[in-house]
């Protein structure tokens, strides 16, 4: 009686890719066009062992796309959607598990607060920082 053959090895970084997709879906970003760009940016950074702060988002987009400005803009739009979603969770219940887990790790606190205030009709919205978001997402993807 032989044992079942070992499952084939997973492609490199597939665990991290799944984790990133999961986080983006929790942030309400999975359906956005730019979410795939964010995943590509993260995988490229993981492969290089670098952060977005070290490389720069514009430089990384230029290496990955024939149209880097469009790639960066799609990612920023998806990120704005994520900031809006996390702020909505915070307005509803600031003890929400996803809000407490992701808000401070992926977005500057003052920007989340500004977006929450905006949702309540008190001032302009927050501005998400793609570099900060990518760096935080890399850490989260490697954690679990």
Q: Where in the sequence are the language-model features?
A:
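C-terminal output/effector regions of signal-responsive regulators
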Residues: 2-75, 83, 92, 123-127, ...
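Charged/polar positions within long, soluble alpha-helices
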Residues: 50, 80-87, 117
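Charge-biased C-terminal accessory regions appended to nucleic-acid-, cytoskeletal NTPase
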Residues: 87, 91-144
């Amino acid at each position: 009686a032989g044992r079942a053959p070992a499952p084939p090895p997973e492609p490199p970084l597939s665990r991290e890719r799944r984790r990133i997709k999961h986080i983006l879906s929790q942030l309400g970003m999975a359906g956005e066009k730019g979410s795939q760009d964010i995943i590509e940016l993260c995988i490229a950074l993981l492969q290089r062992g670098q952060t977005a702060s070290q490389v720069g988002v514009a430089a990384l987009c230029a290496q990955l796309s024939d149209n880097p400005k469009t790639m960066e803009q799609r990612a920023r739009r998806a990120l704005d959607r994520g900031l809006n979603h996390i702020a909505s969770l915070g307005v509803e219940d600031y003890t929400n598990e996803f809000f407490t887990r992701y808000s401070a790790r992926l977005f500057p606190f003052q920007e989340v607060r500004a977006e929450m205030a905006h949702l309540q009709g008190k001032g302009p919205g927050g501005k998400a920082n793609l570099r900060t978001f990518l760096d935080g997402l890399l850490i989260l993807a490697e954690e679990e």
